[in-house]
Amino acid sequence: MATAAASDLESKAKAAFVDDDFELAAELYTQAIEASPATAELYADRAQAHIKLGNYTEAVADANKAIELDPSMHKAYLRKGAACIRLEEYQTAKAALELGYSFASGDSRFTRLMKECDERIAEELSEVPVKKAEDGAAAPSVASFVEEKDDAANMDNTPPMVEVKPKYRHDFYNSATEVVLTIFAKGVPAENVVVDFGEQMLSVSIEVPGEEPYHFQPRLFSKIIPEKSRYQVLSTKVEIRLAKAEQITWTSLDYDKKPKAVPQKIIPPAESAQRPSYPSSKSKKDWDKLEAEVKKEEKEEKLEGDAALNKFFRDIYSDADEDMRRAMMKSFVESNGTVLSTNWKDVGSKKVEGSPPDGMELKKWEY
C-alpha cells in the first residue's frame, strides 16, 4: 500500500503529466517509487511518462515490474505493448496486448494496437528480397512455368503501383515548448548522422557506407528556434528536439499550406544581415534563400475558414500579458481543448471543467 508521501508525489506527478511536463512527471514517479517500491500503479504510470519522452526501453522495464507486482493490471500490459511497438518488437507487443486484453475485454485500445501489430508483422513477412538469377543457378522447374502462366492469365496488363516506403519510420509528439521527432534508425553510428536546423526547415541525413542513404528534409509545421534545437543519436533511434518559436500544438510535422498558413513579421535588413550561422559537417545550405521563399509564399496566401480562426487565436496569445497566457493554457489543457479563457482571476483558483460541443461526449483521460 502506498504511503502518504508516495500518494502526495503520485498526485503531483499526475498533475505534471496533464501539464505535458513528462520529465517532471517521471522524476516525481521515481521519488514515489522510492517511498513505496511495491506499488504496481506507480511503475505503470511512470511507464506512460517514459513513452511520452521516447524512452521506450525504460517504459518496457517499468511495465514488466508493474506486471510482476500485479499480474492482472491490464494497463501495465497496454503500456508494454505500446512501448514494444515503438521499438518495433511487434511479436512481443502482440503477446502482451493479448494477455492484457483478457483482463479488459471490450477496451478498444487493445484491439486497435493488436491490429497495428498484425499489420506490422504482415509487412515484415512480405518484405522478402528478390535477387536476380546468377550464372550456374538451377533452372526454374516446369511447375513454376505453369504457375507463372496461370498467374499471368489472371492479371491485368496494367503494371501494379508500388509504394516506395522510406528507409526509416519516424514519429513525433508535442510538449509545451518542443516537438520531439524520433527517427527509428537502429545501430547507426553518430558520425554518419547530420542534422541541420533552419527557421522553418529541417534537414536529416544518414549516410552509412555500403547502405542506401537516407534524407529527410521537411518544411516544418511552424517556426522553430534553431540555436535551441538539438539532437541525439541513440542505439535504436535518432531523437531530434525542435524548440518551438510559438507555444502552439503542432497537428502535423509538415507545413500544411491551407489550414495553417500564418503571415510572419518581416525581419529588418539589419537584423537579417546579423543572422547567425549554424555549424554542420554537410555542405553549407542557403537557409536565407529558403526562408525568403517561405515568407514570400506566406505573404501571398489568403486566409479563410480555419486558417483565419487560427490566426485570430495566435494574435490573442501573442498580444496577451502573462496572466492571460496562463489562463489560456490552463483552461485549454484542463478542459481537454473545449474551453479557452483569458481571465486568470476566473480560472486560476479552480479546475476548468470540459464543455464539449452539442452532440459530443467528453471522455476522461486514464493515466
Curated annotation (Swiss-Prot):
Keywords: Cytoplasm, Nucleus, Plant defense, Repeat, TPR repeat, Ubl conjugation pathway. TPR repeats lie at residues 6-39, 40-73, 75-107. It is found in: Cytoplasm; Nucleus. Gene3D superfamilies: 2.60.40.790, Tetratricopeptide repeat domain. This is Protein SGT1 homolog. It comes from Oryza sativa subsp. japonica (Rice). Residues 165-254 form the CS domain. It holds the Pfam family TPR_16. SUPFAM superfamilies: HSP20-like chaperones, TPR-like. Residues 277-367 form the SGS domain. The keyword Cytoplasm applies. Residues 261-289, 347-367 are annotated as: Disordered.
